[in-house]
Amino acid sequence: MLDLTYDTPKPRVIAGAKQDWELVIGMEVHAQVSTRAKLFSGASTRFGAEPNSNVAFVDAGMPGMLPVINEACVSQAVRTGLGLKAQINLESAFDRKNYFYPDLPQGYQISQLYHPIVGEGEVLVELGDGLARLVRIERIHLEQDAGKSIHDMDPALSFVDLNRTGVALMEIVSKPDIRSPEEAAAYVVKLRQIMLYLGTCDGNMQNGNLRADVNVSICAPGQYEKYQATQDFSHLGTRCEIKNMNSMRFIQQAIEVEAKRQIAIIEGGGTVDQETRLYDPDKGETRSMRSKEEAHDYRYFPDPDLLPLTFDQAYVDAIAADLPELPDAKKARFIRGFGLSDYDASVLTADIDAAQYFEATATKDTGKLSANWVINELFGRLKKDERQIEDSPVAPAQLASLIALIASDTISGKIAKDVFEISYTTGRDPSEIVETEGLKQVTDTGAIEAAVDQIIADNPAQVAKAQENPKLAGWFVGQVMKATGGKANPKAVNQIVAQKLGG
């Protein structure tokens, strides 16, 4: 694997009225596990079903109903942990987190406080311009999702949909390593990318399948370094948690306004209360939801209905053997094998479907050309039509055929764009289009020379100007291309024009 090295970015510094402040951010990302059934029942996880139609007795908290672990959820959590280079714990356990809410019919959530299934890991978050932040993962644990309370269907009533109750979540908890709003958003993007490659979460933030709680605090310059040396969190300031963020843009906005709120409080002589807050994008502010609870407030205790979850190393090894190539490794291979730039490789590996499409079109010799066509022409056309790459009217084999025609000088780049448009709108194969429409590039130097001679003969005044200023030779090249319908080989045209005018 190619060794990609990056510099660590400086932390975001926010100027207060009295002094500068630095941001400290930790995140808890809740990712819905991609499985057909829930964590402890066989009820479907399908999104968009009729309210309260995907609910088993155990999900509804019916008396006497016992949870049964879904092995597929366990496998997906292990798979995610391996993808984040994390420690897999061969023994973990489930605990009850006790609290009351209408959409939590059991009166508790089954989670993993004391013995999570996955321990410490890491994720490299690339930030562009040769910068990257290594964010440490503290833990990943499995837990049940809650239901959904609906308050806008009736002015006097609230409704509860339990379809989501009991759906498996992976809570991915980071260390307080993130130092700017941009890094926070990029971190969630990278987690989402890795899980999409792994197939462990579909990453759909609109449906609530990926949500983030953001812990924000501020500290004076130099205090973070003291935390690093001592692991004493008091150096980092009092943190506030912003709940249920489901947009990269909102994550960044919420961090900005929350940091400024905390700075104003401290510089005004007050103290920041540790609490859970909600971001209101319409008002551009965070507002208090409740005081931030500690673990003892939830009276955690081991779930008596569930035995400890144990498996052996062979189970982990079997999952590891089935892991796909992940984004960082694929990016490095694209740079090494196809000669791509860091930027182009990043764009192509950002989405697994795009990466697979590119690989189906490229060879070692046409890698850069293929990347240019996929990124600029195909992506641009798909964006215009609001289509995803998996819905592309141009199949990878068709684009590969077009690229081969360009690489072999059968057609020019200009003609290739016309061929691409025809293929995109009709589905026809590029080779067939070129043959049928007579679009092959003119490479006969005799024919090109004749066209050049004719244009020179017809434009003596332009010849005189071009001989005084060689930069004007481009006018003759353009006229030859126009006369040949864009079919003349541009390289040959340039050479012949230069020879004729120079002579």
UniProtKB/Swiss-Prot annotation:
MF terms (GO), sorted A to Z: asparaginyl-tRNA synthase (glutamine-hydrolyzing) activity; ATP binding; glutaminyl-tRNA synthase (glutamine-hydrolyzing) activity
Cross-referenced InterPro entries: Asn/Gln-tRNA_amidoTrfase_suB/E (IPR017959), Asn/Gln-tRNA_Trfase_suB/E_cat (IPR006075), Asn/Gln_amidotransferase (IPR018027), Asn/Gln_tRNA_amidoTrase-B-like (IPR003789), GatB (IPR004413), GatB_C_1 (IPR042114), GatB_Yqey_C_2 (IPR023168), Gln-tRNA_amidoTrfase_suB_CS (IPR017958)
Tree of life domain: Bacteria
Keyword tags: ATP-binding, Ligase, Nucleotide-binding, Protein biosynthesis
Broad class of enzyme this protein falls into: ligase
Pfam families per the UniProt record, alphabetical: GatB_N, GatB_Yqey
Catalytic reaction list: L-glutamyl-tRNA(Gln) + L-glutamine + ATP + H2O = L-glutaminyl-tRNA(Gln) + L-glutamate + ADP + phosphate + H(+); L-aspartyl-tRNA(Asn) + L-glutamine + ATP + H2O = L-asparaginyl-tRNA(Asn) + L-glutamate + ADP + phosphate + 2 H(+)
Keyword Protein biosynthesis assigned: yes
EC number: 6.3.5.-
Any GO BP: glutaminyl-tRNAGln biosynthesis via transamidation
Keyword presence, Disulfide bond: no
Subunit structure, as described in the record: Heterotrimer of A, B and C subunits.
Family: Belongs to the GatB/GatE family. GatB subfamily.
Record HAMAP family: GatB (MF_00121)
Function description: Allows the formation of correctly charged Asn-tRNA(Asn) or Gln-tRNA(Gln) through the transamidation of misacylated Asp-tRNA(Asn) or Glu-tRNA(Gln) in organisms which lack either or both of asparaginyl-tRNA or glutaminyl-tRNA synthetases. The reaction takes place in the presence of glutamine and ATP through an activated phospho-Asp-tRNA(Asn) or phospho-Glu-tRNA(Gln).
Name of the protein: Aspartyl/glutamyl-tRNA(Asn/Gln) amidotransferase subunit B
Annotated source species: Jannaschia sp. (strain CCS1)
